[in-house]
Amino acid sequence: MTKRIRTALCVIVSVLFLASCSSRPDGMHVILFSDMQAGVQEKIKKAAEQNAGKVDIFPAFQEKLLTEITAHEGDVFIVPEDMFQAYDDPENFQPLNGLPPEKTSPYTTVNKKTGEKTIYAVQIEKGKKQLNGYSFQLNRDMAAFIPVYAEKTEEALQLISQLTEAR
């Protein structure tokens, strides 16, 4: 009898240990690529963490972006626009159908059969931004997108919508 209890206890502990090692955060995972000053990065990280479970900020290197996407990390990416244009392929992104219709974006595709326009990424214009009570200045245009494998689409759409609001 004690051997069964020990075995069951080992299985339960192993399952709990493996579950705690999961790389997926409970909330949304935001990945930002930027060459901004550390103080600005911290403001953005604190503001985004109020909506997200995890925020990672990396230097703006194309190779790191491809690594993160290949590893299926992140529910939403915010990258310098010139960096995004090198990776721009609508098949890799979820459509941003939840955004208000007044949002415009240069990143759209048109369905040849229906003529319907689909937004797959948005431009976040440089300038003063506000997110969850934190203000910060973007010195270059950024692009935001949701990769096709992302699980937290609704939360990601809300964050993108906040960042694209004119202030």
Swiss-Prot record:
Assign the protein's first listed, main location to one coarse class: membrane
Q: Name one GO cellular component term.
A: plasma membrane
Annotated gene? yteS
Record-given protein name: Putative lipoprotein YteS
Q: Which domain of life is it from?
A: Bacteria
Lipid attachment residues per UniProt (S-diacylglycerol cysteine): C21
Q: What does this protein do?
A: May play a role in the degradation of type I rhamnogalacturonan derived from plant cell walls.
Record's signal peptide: 1-20
- Membrane topology category: Lipid-anchor
**Keyword Membrane applies:** yes
Residues with lipidation of kind N-palmitoyl cysteine: C21
Subcellular localization is given as: Cell membrane
Q: What induces it?
A: Up-regulated by growth on type I rhamnogalacturonan.
Q: Which terms are listed as keywords in the entry?
A: Cell membrane, Lipoprotein, Membrane, Palmitate, Signal
